Amino acid sequence: MRRTVALFTSALLVAVLPSLPASAAPEPPSPAPGWSVAGDVIRWTAPAPMPPTDAGVEFWEGDRILGTARESADLRTFTLDAKPANPAALQVRSAGRRLDVAEPAPPASLAAPELPALLPQAQADPGKPGPYATSTGEYALDPIKLPEYAAPIEMDAVVVAPKDAPGKRPLVLFLHGRHFTCYSKTNPNQIGMSWPCPAGLTAVPSHRGYLKAQQLLASQGYVTVSISANGINAQDAATIDAGAQGRSSLVRHHLTKWADWAGAARSSAPAAVKSAPPADMSKVLLVGHSRGGEGVNRAATDSLNPPPGDTGFSGPVRWNIRGDVLIGPTIFGHNPQPDVPSVTFLPGCDGDVSDLQGQMFVDQTRGVSRGAALHSALYMVGANHNYFNSEWTPGQAEAPAFDDFWPGEQPDAVCAPGTATRLTADQQQTAGATYIAASAHLFLARDESVLPLLDGSGVRAPSADPARVLSHAVGGDRKPFVVPSLDTQASGSARVCAQVSTDPAAACGAVRSPHLVRFRFASSQPERQSIALKWTAAGQAAVVSPATPVSLHGSKELALRLAVPANAPATRFAISVTDQNGQKRSLGTVSVTGLPGTARLSALWAQEVRVPLPAGVGKATALELVPESASGEALLIDAHGWDKGLVPVVPARLGRVDATVTSVDEGNSGTVTHNVAVTATGNGTRTVRLFYNDTTNTPVTKLVTLKPGEHRVDVPITYTANTKWGPSTRYPVGVVAIDNAVIGAAFGALLVRDDDPAPKLTVAPVADSVGEGGALRWKLTLSEAADSSFTLVGLPLAPGVGELSTTDVDAEWFFQNSGEEALPSRPLSSTGLQLWVSVPPGQTSVEVVVPTVTDAEAEGEEQVKLKFEGRSPTGVGFEVTGKVADAA
């Protein structure tokens, strides 16, 4: 049986988060192995170091999120200050998957996965190199200071540009995601998240990981730059938005420099820039990988809708962002920029952002603005998260690198290396470069010959072979017909289902799906609905009716986004619509085959299928799908009238909405209420949904409409003040756009700063001199009880005389507090031993215990010296020395 370790690093904030209904238990059960709960401090330690992920590590109590944990310096221990009611229900999740337990065995009913057939070849192939030779160079400018980031952020980049290309050229900017920042060139196991890197460690060159795509684009006439964001990665764990605003500011600082260098300041540009053609700042494409995807999306929003307050960038916007490419992106805020076209890569074997939450860059744009901008999703069968960046790829990277698709207890039938469905690193990077180039051709060159590769038309780019890349889209020249809502009617084998709900009867199902990813603090999101189809005999029709008749005039085809379970055989449906005169018109049949999947994948993804629309349909009142198979299930995401080509995208004057962070001192007594402001720009009617907790810590979601002239919503947060010491407490607020609004800062909070002095700590020996087999003990006493755990960590120091070794103490105790085996015997001060001790809230004392064991070896007196330092609060500490006499 695999053992886990119980170590932790203290955080400084208690997060008070929405809780879902749970039955009360008379006595809270104990947490599972690997967990430790001391009052309001929760810690979990992985069996081995876990490189930082873009998705982050979250602690959950059943279905209630407690918050995002912070990693320790050794990348093994994760900590959160929160108060679980049921420690036995604690879970570690990242992008929806469990990290603290072995994954379940695949269900016996899940069919064997098969590689999808190659799609027909498209007329255009953007993966072919262009006519230009390329040049490569780098620049390093003075670092910048950003709010919330203590250390300056580097302004480093690699430039790949075409040689001898005439005139100004479109600019493509790449931003990498969250990765470890430093590594040792002599010890492959030594990595870290510091910035700047300490002595002996080297910065990871993540920004050099997109050279293959940059070289392809440069050969086709685009100037490209890939920027470094190590300074953001090392510090974004302390920010409320996981670094989205900081990444946006970094991008905009670089764009400002490029705008300067394209104009009067060209003579002072770095050599790598001067050797490139001037950039055409009216044609900019942003490419973001992982958290970099969320960062460039925020940069697009900040460029169209300037952010309030100090974001570290205040200059004019001298560029036009024509599109975003988002590679395996995070979107914690569910806040896409609806008026900037986008293409989102969804890697089928993503082991980091494994819930494929980037789907929200498509789905969450519906109904928010005019719907003219194309938003495309590309499902890449067999692609993982890391290999789009060569500096995160084993065998290519300068620093240590790994396959992010975790191996699990048994090989995955789809994603294990060597399977027919898994791409190699080179295949994945080639496919990625090809579809980035397709996006550049479409958004920057307005070359619509590549549009069928991105808009669900079911064709492929030969340069990306053998990759299977499927696409669907919203926006462009589409007219919404069925976009499920609470007003939608469904009958027959169909029902309206909630994408986000704690009610199994109302929910769309428990299967992992990119379309069902929920907003972080939401127990329900009423605006997010789908149509669930389930039939037990061929011909059981599903009928779906929008709230009002919809005109399909001018549309050439009806496009449906339809998902069937992973590995399902080809599932055929006869499609018809009913017009306002009651006439049913048969449109033809569509067929959808399940994507290759296992229980570990988010493969319930909607594929786009189309049927011709005859002339004269006019207004349609109902959509009917009649399955031809004997039984089955499907999920209809939406249906649109479709015509080929794009329509002009004129950004709407959307109101920008931002949740703010309000900081207050706690106070001394009574029930206190403070407001968290949610600010809004714009003068039209704007609708958003808020998420927060009420006075009983019950989750609240509220639909809010801001009328013309209204620019603020106050969210009341109530707490009880006292004179006992405790950590500062964060009460979060979330906001999601519903109509005529774009969200900048999706997360705000009331930060209640504790203003009480910490209790005084005294330490007294209980048994600091024992014989072998005895237990060394010290008692820690506080001058008064606190509201929160009083936490310290102790490290062993060499005592200067005979020192206790790993075999002089209890082996299980040593393993639980170090993660190391006791053999071979070695001094305690040479190990990773950490003794964490917490005085729980409401109590005033606790003992530190070091259990020793007897042995047959004749020894003199041995000692252990422990140095304790406060983690919460900081600034306290002490040293103790224990003596152990030989039993012989």
Question: Which role does the model predict for each range below?
Answer:
Residues 340-416, 425:
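Active-site-adjacent alpha-helix of alpha/beta-hydrolase-fold enzymes
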Residues 25-174, 181:
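Short conserved active-site loop signatures built around small residues
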Residues 649-888:
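Short boundary segments that mark the start of a structured unit
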Residues 1-24:
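Secretory targeting and sorting signals
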Residues 582-619, 629-632, 708-709:
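Extracellular carbohydrate recognition and processing domains
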Residues 163-222:
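Short, surface-exposed "cap/lid" segments of acyl-processing enzymes
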Residues 164-167, 238-288:
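Gly/Ser-rich "nucleophile elbow"/oxyanion-hole loop immediately N-terminal to the catalytic nucleophile
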Residues 25-37, 51-53, 60-65, 71, ...:
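Alpha/beta-hydrolase-fold serine-hydrolase catalytic core, especially in secreted/extracellular enzymes
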